């Protein structure tokens, strides 16, 4: 500090206008010498001046005093003044002007003070900091990821709400990934759905069916949207944008399908990312009165710092759908070639509006516990003994509004609901609402290292406020009333790994107070990996067991077409799953077994029931891509068995075969796949759908299956853009009795041309 102040003072003394007293004296002497030389050039009158001898005699003190007095006399000053001013002419004026300018420009006006010195010191310090900041690269530093991943151009992950643990994923923008325009076909071999894209869906594979425990009416729609636990989070070095469109732009406006997806993500700093997303799935449908508009909007962000890691955002899901209840008679689909729009449907004036709004945050603060280490400053981020303090918060609102108008002379409409009209004989307006406010606080201890065999020990506590609303007759007197449940629970877990060969984790929840008292959930996972070749062989095992209290809507409901009041027991569910993955061979296999006691289901009248006997489910699936020269045989097969098909019907077999010829039109520029895609399943009692409660339910009237649904396609990878062109349901007229039903009395899209493009934009 002393040397810095000295340097600043020295710099101030050298600056123009900041000269020292010594320097100022030097300037004054130069000016005086110049003035004297200018005055010596003036001619003095002899009479007014003293005669000066060539030799000056020595004077005594009296003579010196007399001389001094003579010089001080007024007439001497007046004489010199007269001489000076009378001798100024145009040649001497520029001399005075230049001298005055030089003096004003070069002579210090004032000396530097303490404030000047401090100001210069601050300036020098700022310049030093700016130079260091400019020289330092902007690199993400975090304990969440190993330093080998800091320099990846883009990172994608999801985080769980229990412990805010990130699960890294990939970003696949290839033509193979974007070929399936229906989200359900990306996750499963097949599914039951209501025809248009974005409508209610139920997967064939029992082990891939998703649920919304807090709002059961959203279960058929959650697979086409995002939640706080499966929404992708990004960290990218340069801005990244995805634009996608797929649909039937050449179809009739009455049955047009139009889908859109937009994602734009950018890092504001190396640690902070901001993402905007929008997705629209929808179609006017093949039948009358089945317009579907399914939209999801996302505003999310994340911060991945040295000690702080957070994922946060808001998700808005909205579905507006006209409900037709399916065709009145399947004869018009199987045995005729009548235009689909002219076929009569069960409901002519019915609709559903679903809304879900979710705000969430998952955050963790890392605290290194190395207080007694002398070299703790050199300790790598995330290494050694650490504690992680975390919080997970969520506020979600769900709503469903169903409305219909069924006249007294509408035979098919009234028969569709089995002539059940409890509140009004002609119109319905039923509303279901749920509000979920939940907070979790947890601590994660890292005893040794993030890659140790015992890497983390976790514990937490949670509090949930669940408010539900459904109409009750008492509301006529009291108005709308929410039924509120409070739930308190504790949870914990542990995880670890052994290099890259073994990884394990386990967690458990237990509700000790509230509506869900004595509910529990236990999960375990073990992954073994060996590497005899590139990509390795990976075997994963999962185990789950739990006890769950039925939702308030499952216990009691009062609507115009359905009502019940139950006292169901807790549902017990245990599963065992195994997965095998060999990337080099493009092979994936899975096995699943489930045992469910007190299973809930909806009977043929769409009334909820509880099965009093255990139900066993077994499933085997295989995905293998065979290659023969340029021919690809991409096959997915699913086999399933249910011990109680009268309660849980499942297709015994389902396949998805995509066979194509792969051709490089221009190497590393354009690749084209030309082939056929077929989906099929064995005959089974496909479920029916009840629009007012928003649930799939049993039907035993008719079986569907054994007829493949085929698309002829051209799939193109043109640099970054992936483009497909399909002729859907190409063999619609090739079968004697086509049964292209997606669910009971709901049909799949008929023949038509579909076009899609997916284009990512980025620079790296």
Where are these regions (language model features)?
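Positively charged n-region of N-terminal signal peptides that target proteins for export
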Residues: 1-4, 276
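Short periplasmic/luminal acceptor-recognition loop of GT-C membrane glycosyltransferases, typified by
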Residues: 2, 22, 650
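Generic early N-terminus positional signal peaking at residue ~5-7
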Residues: 5-6, 26, 619, 634
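Hydrophobic h-region of N-terminal signal peptides that target proteins for export
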Residues: 9-17
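Membrane-proximal, glycine/serine-rich, low-complexity loop/turn segments characteristic
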Residues: 21-357, 366-382, 527, 531, ...
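Exposed, low-structure sequence patches enriched in small/polar residues
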Residues: 236-238, 243, 349-411, 416-764
